[in-house]
Design a protein with these regions (language model features):
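Soluble or luminal CAZymes and related metallo-dependent hydrolases
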Residues: 35-42, 120-127, 155
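Hydrophobic, secondary-structure "cap" segments at the distal end of domains
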Residues: 83-140
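Flexible, active-site-adjacent loop/turn segments at secondary-structure boundaries
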Residues: 10, 26-27, 63, 109-110, ...
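Active-site rim elements
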Residues: 31-34, 115-125, 147-150
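Substrate-binding surface in catalytic domains of secreted glycosidases
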Residues: 1-93
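Short secondary-structure transition/capping segments
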Residues: 20-33, 102-104, 190-198
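Acidic/aromatic/glycine-rich contiguous surface patches that form carbohydrate-binding/processing clefts
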Residues: 67, 124-204
């Protein structure tokens, strides 16, 4: 891609009010396997393999919010509206009328209300870790988030901290950032050379 620096892949909103069943907002892998709504990994694969976007120009989107359904379980039917829930509203729900569950297919958590009336899919520090590892393994250009203000809790910015620990501290990531900075520097130097040549041409005329 010669005219675009990078693409921010919106690897979230995989499921929502338009779906025919309860599903994760941002499942790393399909849950259940083969779910036609797809997943983060199938989305990245489509952009890379089908659309031909280089992996190092793809940024993996990390959501700092979840989706709440009127339903009794993951992959079940639901009724009514699906409500977006910011991450900073979620930790206090755990063990306070809601039970934490982990989906081994999606590599994502979810909460079930104790009376089985609602389910909340979201990302936490653990699922963010898996997504960061995926971005590193696939040698993607980076990660991006939506949105900063959704992450602030009494324990600090927990999801940002997970990105810092599992992505920014990676040796592979540090090398990638160094390569990107070198590329930016080289492009800047090239632009300066072109500008100088253009100015000389004007003077010669």
């Amino acid at each position: 891609m010669f005219y675009v620096d990078f693409f921010n892949a919106m690897t979230y909103d995989i499921h929502g009010g338009w779906s025919d069943h309860v599903g994760h907002n941002s499942p790393l892998y399909q849950s259940p396997p083969g779910d036609p709504d797809g997943s983060c990994s199938t989305g990245i694969s489509y952009l890379s393999n089908t659309r031909g976007i280089p992996d190092n120009q793809l940024n993996f989107g990390l959501p700092f919010w979840g989706k709440k359904y009127n339903s009794s379980g993951i992959n079940e039917s639901f009724s009514g509206d699906v409500i977006d829930e910011w991450y900073n509203e979620i930790p206090d729900l755990i063990d306070n009328g809601w039970t934490y569950e982990w989906d081994n297919n999606a590599f994502c958590p979810y909460l079930i209300k104790d009376d089985q009336s609602k389910i909340l899919t979201f990302d936490d520090q653990e699922s963010i870790r898996y997504k960061c590892e995926f971005a590193i393994d696939q040698e993607l250009g980076g990660v991006m988030i939506w949105a900063l203000g959704y992450d602030v809790t009494e324990n600090g910015q927990e999801l940002i901290q997970s990105i810092a620990q599992n992505y920014l501290s990676s040796e592979v990531t540090r090398e990638l950032i160094a390569d990107q900075l070198l590329l930016i520097h080289s492009q800047h130097q090239y632009q300066k050379i072109l500008q100088t040549q253009y100015q000389r041409k004007i003077v010669d005329q």
